[in-house]
Amino acid sequence: YTVSATDNAGCVTSTSVTITQPPVLTVNLTATQPKCFGATNGFGVAAAFGGVPSYTYAWVPALAGNSATSNQVGAGNYGLTVTDGNGCTVTSSMSLVNPPAMAASITSTNATCFSACNGIAIATVTNNIGPVSYVWTGGASPVLSQTLTGACANTYTVLATDQNSCTA
């Protein structure tokens, strides 16, 4: 902008001013999904650019926190408002989704005779991530195997755990 002034004697003076604006405020939001069905270990990481530092962060719902990295949360929809040093705002959102629930099934063969300890049970899991460890309980001591052999008549329980610590 330029302004000019002329006095009574006809002398002219002028001056200019340039008004600038900061770069546009933007935010990049990266979501990390929960590792197990129903887990509360998902989170978001925001990176603000432009505007005028410093930045403040407000997640919705509030349980997600007020920093660039959200608190650990479960599946759901989350909003984020970033405010720069001039009070300008930008919003973004993310959706966290549960992975499919890990599930276990058991096939078994009963003991062949009364008091025989030759029963077999085999655990199978679906929706696991990576290798699975198995722990059978109900016998004299825990069995760390996918297959339970030499089982006497009893009720047995298996706990299957994958590499994300998801269980079934």
Predicted regions span which residues?
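Proline- and Ser/Thr-rich low-complexity, intrinsically disordered segments
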Residues: 1-168
